[in-house]
């Protein structure tokens, strides 16, 4: 895992994008504006790593492909947090996004108070299908800190320890080549 500071200009750009565009174009479980903002921030930071700029919502729905690198389609999944990420943490993935034609998932956590993004790791869709755990809508899940929440949609989980670890932007790019 590695953590980077998020440029305030990127955050402001993402706020404008979320105010102008609805990034929850699914039939259900579209996420709140705050959840959409978290996702757009994570996606924009990772896009910027690869020289792809920031998210531009005017192009419409991206079919689950946030960027392409080394001929691989990549979907960036970002969870919002108010604590630093730990290796034992879990990443959530909505089942209804499973049909997208994506080769790679990059899982991130955005610390909303410190405004830093942690790249937790990445995994191929093929490996994700093998390693993930499924929880139907309404399941009660227990977090790392022993608090609980009820799933609002069918959900997959994968732990940080099951992702390919990366130590830097360069390491991430080299592993994805």
Located regions from the model:
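Nucleic-acid endonuclease domains
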Residues: 1-70, 77-177
